[in-house]
């Protein structure tokens, strides 16, 4: 996992009471964890959708046109709608599709669910994402892991907009 504690000093040094932090790590619950590290700073939560690959040493290449940031205030953070919309405008002016979430806890869990199922399936079978699109044991594993995430989400009282397994399959089949 990520060592969030290691960034505390940097965040304290680089921010003040007017700073707004939007973590976009593929980790569920990042915003609240960072908020506890730097209580004097406003920390939201977020997730990013982008497709890319390591194309060289210290280099990442974006593939396709998917580049979307979903963000919002987690339960213990109060941020004005005006501030959230100002961030959205800045991101959109930079060419990033930005969405303000009405339930960032749900939306970051959904992203985590997809990434987790894909990463474990890919690592276990040593296959790229395209193999999950084909019927068989690789896809069945991805479905099983997505079902486990759905069960965990229900235990966490997360209300999904749609069935998380169907959603994950829709994403993988695009």
Model features per residue range: what roles?
Residues 1-59:
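Rossmann-like NAD(P)(H) cofactor-binding subdomain of soluble oxidoreductases
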Residues 13-14, 37-42, 57-162:
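Internal alpha-helical scaffold of NAD(P)-dependent oxidoreductase catalytic cores
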Residues 166-174:
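Short, intrinsically disordered, charge-balanced linker/junction segments flanking boundaries
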Residues 50, 103-106, 170:
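Short, solvent-exposed loop/turn elements at beta->coil junctions and helix N-caps
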């Amino acid at each position: 996992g990520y060592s969030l504690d290691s960034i505390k000093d940097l965040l304290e040094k680089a921010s003040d009471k007017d700073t707004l932090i939007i973590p976009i790590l593929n980790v569920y619950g990042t915003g609240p964890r960072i908020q506890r590290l730097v209580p004097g700073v406003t920390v939201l939560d977020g997730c990013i959708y982008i497709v890319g690959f390591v194309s060289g040493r210290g280099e990442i290449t974006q593939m396709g046109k998917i580049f979307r940031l979903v963000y919002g205030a987690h339960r213990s953070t109060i941020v004005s709608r005006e501030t959230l919309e100002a961030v959205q405008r800045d991101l959109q002016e930079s060419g990033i599709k930005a969405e303000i979430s009405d339930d960032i806890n749900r939306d970051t869990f959904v992203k985590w669910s997809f990434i987790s199922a894909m990463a474990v399936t890919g690592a276990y079978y040593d296959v790229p994402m395209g193999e999950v699109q084909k019927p068989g044991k690789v896809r069945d594993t991805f479905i099983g892991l997505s079902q486990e995430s759905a069960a965990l989400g229900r235990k966490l009282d997360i209300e999904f907009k749609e069935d998380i397994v169907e959603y994950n399959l829709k994403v993988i089949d695009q």
